[in-house]
Amino acid sequence: MIAILDYGMGNIHSCLKAVSLYTKDFVFTKDHSTIENSKALILPGDGHFDKAMENLNSTGLRKTIDKHVTSGKPLFGICIGFQILFESSEEIAQGSKKEQIEGLGYIKGKIKKFHGKDFKVPHIGWNRLQIRRKDKSVLLKGIGDQSFFYFIHSYRPTDAEGNAITGLCDYYQEKFPAVVEKNNIFGTQFHPEKSHTHGLKLLENFIRFI
């Protein structure tokens, strides 16, 4: 069974619908025992980094996720679920005295806002994916270099560990990690469930891998 985490983030329906194309053995849940008994975990959704981590910490779900990862089971983060895989983010609530928020820390790197001096922020719409280390990739099998995926975000990873990056995106000549894969940790900055053929192929690859 695949557990799709209910942690208060938005835009969940399209993810559930896309996963259902490849398996009926999944559940949208925040129940700790259900997550512990799952064979894979997906962190979906749109939202803010600080709120996502606040929800995970206050509900004890962070410890449950850590236990899942330590056991070697696959974890897949999408959009905000991708960003919280990293060490920290500067996306904090207005009025907060903190300079950054701690993430799950499974992938080295920090989440920072696009500077937006010469281009529009947020980055919304279709963009090409530059594939790296395709022979090492689980998610990108059968997907061609420069394929288009759908993005919507204002923040991106910086100083990310190179060996974990299997896909990059170029937004106004600023390259940022868009796909990471490290042992049993997987993530995409874009929304595969909104990315039509290529996105659905990526989701299928993950589900077949489990």
From Swiss-Prot:
Gene source species: Leptospira interrogans serogroup Icterohaemorrhagiae serovar Lai (strain 56601)
Entry superkingdom: Bacteria
Active-site residue list: 79 (nucleophile), 191, 193
Pathway involvement of the protein, from the record: Amino-acid biosynthesis; L-histidine biosynthesis; L-histidine from 5-phospho-alpha-D-ribose 1-diphosphate: step 5/9
Location within or outside the cell: Cytoplasm
Presence of the UniProt keyword Transport in the record: no
UniProt-recorded name of the protein: Imidazole glycerol phosphate synthase subunit HisH
InterPro entries for this protein: Class_I_gatase-like, GATASE, Imidazole-glycPsynth_HisH
GO MF annotation list: glutaminase activity; imidazoleglycerol-phosphate synthase activity; lyase activity
Signal peptide stretch: none
